[in-house]
Swiss-Prot record:
GO terms for biological process: photosynthesis, light harvesting. The LH35 protein is synthesized as a 100 kDa polyprotein and is entirely imported into the chloroplast where it is subsequently cleaved into 5 mature 20 kDa LH35 proteins. This is Light-harvesting complex I LH35 proteins. Keywords: Chloroplast, Photosynthesis, Photosystem I, Plastid. One of its GO terms (cellular component) is photosystem I. InterPro entries: Chloro_AB-bd_pln, Chloroa_b-bind. PANTHER family: CHLOROPHYLL A/B BINDING PROTEIN.
Amino acid sequence: PTVYERMRVAEVFNGRLAMLAIVGCVYPELLGNGVWFEVWNKVDFYRFALISLQVVAPLEYWRGNGGFGWDGEEKYDRSYPGFDPCNLTTEYTKAAEIKNGRLAMIGMFGLEVQNHVTAQGPVANLIEHLRHPLAANIGANLAHPWPPVAMFATTGHKDGVWFPGAQPPAHLTGEYPADRGFDPLSVAADPTVYARMRVSEVFHARLSMLAIVGSIVPELLGKGAWFEVGNSVDGIKLGFILMAIAAPTEYWRGNGGFNWDKGTADRSYPGFDPLKLTTDYTKREIKNGRLAMTGLLGLTFQYLATGESPLANLAAHFANPVGANITTTLA
């Protein structure tokens, strides 16, 4: 029931956010102000993010420490805390909001895929479809040739490709560490996007490797499972402290820190390497980071499926390999 309650609140929250996002993705294009995926060409992302944090963080801190009376007897519904001057929170409007919110969340995912496949905005795609219904539609886009298959990997992919016999796309040359030639949707065809994705992958890989350690070591030391951390730590206060520390650094970094605007430094490896690890270990870092990101997803699904920690599941499996495994859980 506790998880279900949190999921219902999260669904309403993200549904509202997605509906606003749909309007924000379509309306500017209708007004001739550009498509949604070009917004960062006109807006300083780091300054925008910092302003958003400054506005949201105090409100979230107040909300998590008793705002709306949530710490008391839960008199208020977290999705509908009581502010309703137009009397819109009827049973009908609540159901309609959730349905439209779900549609908007799926729509946002569709806009992302549409951008990678057609490189056009939703309005431009709609106009093209109305002009040529038979030639411009999802079937025509899916019919475009995908990367061909060959018997051997092309020159440059020294570690081979992601699947035996697969032919990598032209924009994945094997130049960068752990490039296995996997990009069926040509997401990285744009060099600028590809550069940003490489930096993002290394960043999240490092974060995930730390998170894996933080998820297992405390349990080994008898400090509880990773999903119980919120019982001993004020998550809102911790998040606020982290944002207060990280925001100035991110703002400085986004405005020329490490000389990134001059293109003189690699964003993933800015030069701090006293142990000389950024030579032979970059490939291993990415591979282990990918494994860690997948592992974190596995820990989450494991908890949702069994309600137990990774070490508890491992101990149960060792005690009864036939009766405690993924097949028995799925059954």
